[in-house]
Amino acid sequence: MTPTPNVRLSSLTFAIAAMLAFPVGLPAYADVSPSQVTALDMGDKPLKSPSASDYLERADVQAFLAEVHKTYKIPMAWLEDEVAVARYSETAERLMTPKARDPIVRKDTPKDKKVPKRDFSQYAKPFLSAERIARGQEFMARNKAVFDEIDKTHGVPRHVITAVIGVETMYGRNMGRYRVLDSLMTLSFDYTRRATFFKKELATFLDFCWRQEISPVTVLGSFAGAIGYGQFMPSSVDRWGLDGDKDGKIDLIGNEADAIASVANFLVAHGWTPGRGVLYTVTATEDIFEATGSGGIEAHTTVGDLAKAGVKLYDHFPLPEDEPVLLVDLPQRNAKGHLYTKWYLGTRNFSAILRYNRSYFYAAAVTLLADRIAKAPK
């Protein structure tokens, strides 16, 4: 799971490594969406020799495997047999390396101050296609029994869960074509910027495969190691993965019921509130955004406080004054190419989606797709 335009953040709790092609303060490895990456060319020359035996010969890898063996009680022979076939992935290291962004000058911005290119309407366009909406309805229809159960146990609307999976992988069509073992080995031992993080993911992945009786080399996913319909990183599978069809296994690659239950479980764990909306249109300014300390993912203020700060609410606004919210800015371009901003109040449900992917663009695209799926003719 998949990347942050205008969110001003620095940490990644749900590390799906989803990487949006828009600027913001995500960790360095969050630059490209897994679903986008699967279509990239893998034919470039590798930076290192992709010998299958290289990793097992390295002292740091042997030390790591010994620690995994000790911590998870996995036979050393199994670990060595599996890691012996791991190959260095130039693609994973290249795509994880951040690239400089091309700045532009806003019409109303001083000439000496540059702002990054950001256009939510362009970002959201492919996620709101007629095909993605229609496939979303099909996904809900064939999993009706599963969603009926999720309604009772979790209270997350089916169209929201469907939209997350639709944005992440087009309902399982683009789950990634990279060997997860190769990606995680490369990012653990050759990509030093995030080695500690990826070693934890690799250890969790090996433990999961051992317990589920899966050969790690057979698992395909994103270049960053995200897996399945919802693009969960291994630690997220371990923490929030659910056996949706009660068959005794958690399969987020081949089992839609497990994927649906796991996405719902994640959202609930991060504050999803049944019966509450997600985004509400308001009028605001950049000055208000800055003055109220906005820009994070938490609902850190209230409707009443933002109204006092100058945010204009529409008549018959449905949220109470003490409702926790955050101010959301979605920059985009008009027909003449000039930047302007649409403003919204996001509820704790918007924050829950942001914990899946710390990007206002991402969470808003999921929200819009969910709305289109719910309202489209059956």
Regions found by a protein language model. Give the residues of each.
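Amphipathic alpha-helical interface segments
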Residues: 222-229, 236
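Cell-wall glycan-active module
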Residues: 1-4, 10, 19-193, 199, ...
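Short, conserved active-site entrance elements at the starts or edges of catalytic domains
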Residues: 204
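Acidic (Asp/Glu) carboxylate-rich active-site/surface patches
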Residues: 16
